[in-house]
Amino acid sequence: MATTLNPSEISELIKNRIEKVKLAAESRNEGTVTSVSDGIVRIFGLADVMQGEMIELPNNSFALALNLERDSVGAVVLGGYEHLREGDVAKTTGRILEVPVGPELLGRVVNALGEPIDGKGPLGTDLTAPVERVAPGVIWRKSVDQPVQTGYKSVDSMIPIGRGQRELIIGDRQTGKTAMAIDAVINQKGTGIKCVYVAIGQKASTIANIVRKLEENGALAHTVVVAATASESAAMQYISAYSGCTMGEYFMDRGEDALIVYDDLSKQAVAYRQISLLLKRPPGREAYPGDVFYLHSRLLERAARVSEEYVEKFTEGKVTGKTGSLTALPIIETQAGDVSAFVPTNVISITDGQIFLETDLFNAGIRPAVNAGISVSRVGGSAQTKIIKKLSGGIRISLAQYRELAAFAQFASDLDEATRKQLERGQRVTELMKQKQYAPMSIANQALSIYAVNEGYLDDVPVNKLLAFEEGLHAHFANTQGELINKVNATGGWDNDIEGAFKKGIAEFKTTGSW
């Protein structure tokens, strides 16, 4: 006997079945790739895209949205783009570019996206942070009053750098800019300062050599190397500086001190210019886009010394009573010593001072080739170690007077005694400021050398034997006054007892004649 259903039962069954069906509504924002060339993709039909948003492309590749136009989006591909074709589907992700952060990155070499490229396996961190971030506000900042020792006599005495400062290293190619920055990184061993070295647009062989030198000097353990080599795309070279800054900020935000080197921002500006021109943005001076100043200012403003309140707020009370800092050493390469070019003037105006390295000094054998006349540190003076501040006052004056008199003495037939003495003192100060690469000097040894030249102990030492005398003097104090040297290095203090010990020790060493 057949079962009969009346219409109301049928409609009830259908209604129940419909109610049981769960349809998950999924909203997708998709567009179509209309052109691919030189690492730039144009996408039609994407709506609600953020500036700097990650756009998903086929084969697990991504692009960064930079141009938001009326009916299309101009984006730069991160990595290879050979597999992309016109008509490919592009999707928004709702995410800004993030990179891995954390202490696990120390001792590693990563690319601009934070992916390890040193063959040592995964990083072992799940923490990430956005590459672009607003710099700490004025309220959260503290004044710079703690030193960052570079280990260079000329820098620590005349152009001191403080924690949270931005100090530009500027000069022509092959004047020792990278060498100075690497020595500063090496000198942080044992100080607790974490370092980030960002290599932008350099040869892979050069970066490999730097990593090897850091390892040999025991500095790689406290350093992250971010490498965007010359063979990588302009997008990777542009992003790398911000990625490195994010990795350094991790330590600053948690009440620690970090040092970051950008080597160099000239190449980053060139990479950004390339991207901007390919995106058809209007060119300005030297064909750079109008926002090239903002490119560097938003990066360098993220270097700061932040207050205890900032650290406590950021860590939600887990870290209290500690200030954090990120010190930046940006490098700029000039062409034929022209510091009035567009990018050098921009970065000089953003930073808190500059160390100017000169080709003529470098070729004359004065290395580091620091031009003390136009090098300056605007905020580092208040962070300088007490003993160095006390002793180094006469160094800059001696050098300035020497340069002035040396130019004048070329035209004078005979010189009076006072002028001759000033010239000889200047010669000795210039010679004493020379220093070998990968040989950073401790505070006590710097103080010893400066004290000896200021007090006239080196006036009777031949100029060509000065560096040998200095080396012997340091060895003599290490053997006979080890406790004093350790005390000065630990406290950075200066008193009559230390001065008396310096006088006695230098006089003793001079009588040995073992130099």
From Swiss-Prot:
Family: Belongs to the ATPase alpha/beta chains family.
Upper lineage: Bacteria, Pseudomonadati, Pseudomonadota, Gammaproteobacteria, Lysobacterales
Compartment(s): Cell inner membrane
Annotated site (Required for activity): 375
A GO cellular-component term linked to this record: proton-transporting ATP synthase complex
Catalytic activity: ATP + H2O + 4 H(+)(in) = ADP + phosphate + 5 H(+)(out)
Binding site for ATP: 171-178
Described purpose of this protein according to its UniProt entry: Produces ATP from ADP in the presence of a proton gradient across the membrane. The alpha chain is a regulatory subunit.
Subunit structure: F-type ATPases have 2 components, CF(1) - the catalytic core - and CF(0) - the membrane proton channel. CF(1) has five subunits: alpha(3), beta(3), gamma(1), delta(1), epsilon(1). CF(0) has three main subunits: a(1), b(2) and c(9-12). The alpha and beta chains form an alternating ring which encloses part of the gamma chain. CF(1) is attached to CF(0) by a central stalk formed by the gamma and epsilon chains, while a peripheral stalk is formed by the delta and b chains.
MF term (GO), any: ADP binding
CDD domains: ATP-synt_F1_alpha_C, ATP-synt_F1_alpha_N, F1-ATPase_alpha_CD
InterPro entries: ATP_synth_asu-like_sf (IPR023366), ATP_synth_asu_C (IPR000793), ATP_synth_asu_C_sf (IPR038376), ATP_synth_F1_a_nt-bd_dom (IPR033732), ATP_synth_F1_asu (IPR005294), ATPase_a/bsu_AS (IPR020003), ATPase_F1/V1/A1_a/bsu_N (IPR004100), ATPase_F1/V1/A1_a/bsu_N_sf (IPR036121)
The protein's name in its UniProt record: ATP synthase subunit alpha
Topological relation to the membrane, as annotated: Peripheral membrane protein
Stored PROSITE patterns: ATPASE_ALPHA_BETA
EC number of the protein: 7.1.2.2
Main location (coarse class): membrane
Keyword annotations from UniProtKB, A to Z: ATP synthesis, ATP-binding, Cell inner membrane, Cell membrane, CF(1), Hydrogen ion transport, Ion transport, Membrane, Nucleotide-binding, Translocase, Transport
NCBIfam families: atpA, PRK13343.1
Organism: Stenotrophomonas maltophilia (strain R551-3)
